[in-house]
């Protein structure tokens, strides 16, 4: 394939993901278009943006999206998907949300129903694979991480990784506030409690953002100020993929945890399972594709209405639902993992083995090829015509000159 890449903005995310010394990143960088111009119409366009921005510019157009983290995508997103020839979702949950929803089409003047808006184009699912060369069991810990973890006195820590987004207590998408409260409640007033590490941030890694994270932690902590509470540590700042893996594997990290309300896929949880340590989480939305119920410390959950504060107005819907864990059971499971850790270790190793086989970059590449190749096979290709060579002209007869008579 002759691949060209057009970089697109994603909110306030800085364009600093590519590392100059990384050979894979170098291959990406040299394919980025410096000017948004192409010499001809491309055969295939893979558009990886939010669906209302999908644009068909090629002979075959494929939209790729994680969808939205609740059950009702916006109508404009469904319209965007219908502009494409195929739509690829990152999980069965996100695909199902698009397939099930229908909207009434209203006349702008009369407001009468003119028809139904629904997803009409073909769909497929392509998971977000993890790099098995990076995410794996390791004992290697960088000096930077070693210094950070040296400040943690506990030898048993639960680790959460994810953004702390908007919303009141219990309403942020990752449900970090309630996870904190459950942790404090379950292990308060104990002599040797475990710790909780939050690798989190809001919009970035600034000092202002770090202070905002501390303010949120203290808001929950202060509501329980009469108790002796276990320690919660904030790990704030940018880590490389290798450092993220080292963090997952640090000997003080004994288990991964998430109360997430909704995921389009949940790749940080997938990458964390590659460390071979227990994962405590609901098997509910996007992560249900790779969290095996036999190997996960599964938190019971139910589908509940999404609070209005959790999403921007354009993405919210009063009928939308997401997952909410049973907080009482979640606390008991955390306590059991802490008190009976050995019984969970073998299952965690099995989950690691299964996920490394099924959800690697290589497996993702094979699945993408299975999806894309049939589409490309039907694209008309220019054919070079080979005309037959012409025979040489016969030699002209030289007639004798007539003598003048």
Explain the meaning of each model-derived region.
Residues 130-243:
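Conserved catalytic-core segment of nucleotide-activated headgroup transferases in glycan assembly
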Residues 246-264, 274-277:
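Acidic donor-binding loop of glycosyltransferase active sites
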């Amino acid at each position: 394939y002759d691949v060209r890449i057009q970089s697109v903005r994603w909110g306030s995310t800085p364009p600093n993901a590519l590392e100059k010394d990384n050979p894979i990143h170098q291959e990406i960088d040299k394919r980025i278009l410096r000017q948004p111009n192409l010499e001809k119409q491309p055969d295939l366009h893979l558009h990886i943006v939010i669906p209302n921005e999908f644009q068909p510019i090629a002979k075959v157009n494929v939209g790729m999206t994680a969808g939205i983290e609740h059950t009702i995508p916006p109508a404009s997103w469904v319209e965007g998907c219908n502009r494409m020839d195929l739509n690829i979702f990152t999980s069965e949950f996100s695909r199902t949300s698009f397939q099930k929803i229908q909207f009434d089409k209203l006349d702008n003047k009369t407001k009468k129903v003119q028809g139904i808006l629904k997803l009409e184009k073909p769909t497929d699912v392509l998971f977000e694979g993890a790099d098995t060369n990076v995410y794996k069991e390791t004992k290697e810990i960088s000096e930077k991480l070693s210094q950070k973890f040296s400040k943690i006195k506990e030898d048993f820590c639960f680790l959460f990784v994810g953004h702390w987004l908007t919303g009141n207590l219990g309403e942020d998408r990752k449900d970090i506030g309630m996870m904190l409260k459950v942790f404090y409640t379950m292990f308060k007033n104990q002599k040797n409690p475990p710790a909780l590490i939050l690798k989190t941030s809001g919009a970035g890694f600034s000092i202002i953002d770090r202070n905002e994270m501390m303010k949120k932690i203290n808001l929950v902590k202060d509501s329980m100020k009469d108790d002796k509470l276990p320690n919660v540590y904030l790990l704030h700042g940018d880590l490389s993929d290798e450092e993220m893996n080292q963090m997952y594997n640090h000997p003080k990290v004994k288990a991964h945890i998430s109360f997430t309300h909704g995921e389009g896929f949940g790749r940080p949880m997938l990458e964390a399972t590659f460390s071979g340590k227990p994962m405590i989480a609901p098997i509910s939305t996007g992560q249900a594709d790779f969290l095996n119920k036999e190997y996960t410390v599964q938190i019971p959950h139910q589908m509940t209405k999404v609070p209005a504060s959790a999403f921007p107005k354009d993405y919210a819907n009063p009928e939308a639902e997401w997952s909410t864990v049973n907080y009482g059971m979640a606390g008991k499971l955390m306590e059991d993992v802490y008190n009976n850790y050995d019984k969970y270790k073998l299952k965690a190793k099995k989950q690691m083995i299964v996920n490394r086989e099924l959800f690697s970059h290589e497996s993702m590449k094979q699945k993408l090829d299975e999806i894309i190749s049939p589409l490309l096979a039907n694209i008309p290709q220019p054919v070079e015509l080979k005309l037959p060579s012409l025979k040489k002209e016969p030699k002209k007869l030289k007639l004798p000159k007539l003598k003048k008579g």
